[in-house]
Amino acid sequence: MNISELWRFPVKGLRGELLKEVAITPNAPFPLDRRFALAHGKSGITYESPKWALKTEFHMLMHNLDECLTELTPHFDETSRLLTILRNGVEEARTFVDDPRGQEEINRYFKRLLSKTDSTIGPQFVQALDFQFGNIEEPVISLINLASVRQLSETIGKHIDVARFRGNIIIDGASPWEERDWVNRIVTINDATFIVVDETIRCGATLVNPDSCERDLNIPKFLQQNYGHMFCGVYLIAKQEGIISPDASISVSN
């Protein structure tokens, strides 16, 4: 088994960034993964008072009319604190995230973009401080098995892009659904070690085609109908530091 791809998603719900390597820190997510998010205006979550919350409090692909988020690619420079948003490859917004005027500008941009779903107060661009805006509160890293996605694709007779699952670590060379037996086991990649803490249940976000931005495949329904569950992938928590990169070998032990 080996790593096929590594991804992080600086802004929850938007497109990800393909990585050449990742420095793993114990009990921490990928650097910058889900660092920022778009909280619903009525959630009470603000840039000044950020907090972890359930995904229902945020704009993300699970929600109808938020599909346009998959057209957006964020680039964040941690040194300058400059966030740039590209839409289909064209720059649409840029702002220094710690500047109050910049925060107002990015909020106005997303209010225009998401006016059909959050027209009163508007989305609030927020930053996580010592946590991430993940789907669960623990500092997890998401792993997706390409073989499982391929088998599901063959079963339903339709191509499924692994990008629908928004995983951090994409692996190849495992058996289909082998990862379902890894809960409470240790994954080792180079010097880094992880414990598998849970399976990942799939939600309506996976319905969205990352290329067309349309809801065209009901992935949770297909999983339930064909396998009797709605899981695809597992969550890891890092336990030992190390550097991981594509093509690195993966081992699983008790």
Indicate residue ranges for each PLM-predicted region.
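Metal-cofactor-dependent catalytic cores
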Residues: M1-N254
